[in-house]
Amino acid sequence: MDGAPVVAITGMTFHDLIGTRYQQGVDTTKLMQDVALYNVEVTGPEHAVLVTNRACRVALGDRGVAHLTVSKDTQMMRLATDKRSMGNPGARTSSSWMQVVNQPPLDQLRAAADALNSGRKVAILVGQGP
């Protein structure tokens, strides 16, 4: 992967036909498990709100693929008619997303530069972790 943030949304057959070898049925969650950092089957409109928020944050914050799959009948549901479960208190995240700044404070950067500049045989091993 090239580190681009991606939210992939795929469709599935009707929820009660999943896993029944229905015509052209594909387990898209399983299909995406090796490439997706976040991989969820959406079960209803309220669930879609939470997991879409999370998928966007994972894709942007971790710079990778987030995948949501939605059954055909779930796609036709209305948010206004769906109810949250008793365990779901509602919104859990901020309404805004802030990009992570991967830069040290200026004083630490200067201290590192001074340490490197004062060395006689300096070697730098650079890479980008996961």
Language model: regions and residue ranges:
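N-terminal alpha/beta PP-like core and its mobile active-site loop of ThDP/TPP-dependent enzymes
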Residues: 1-130
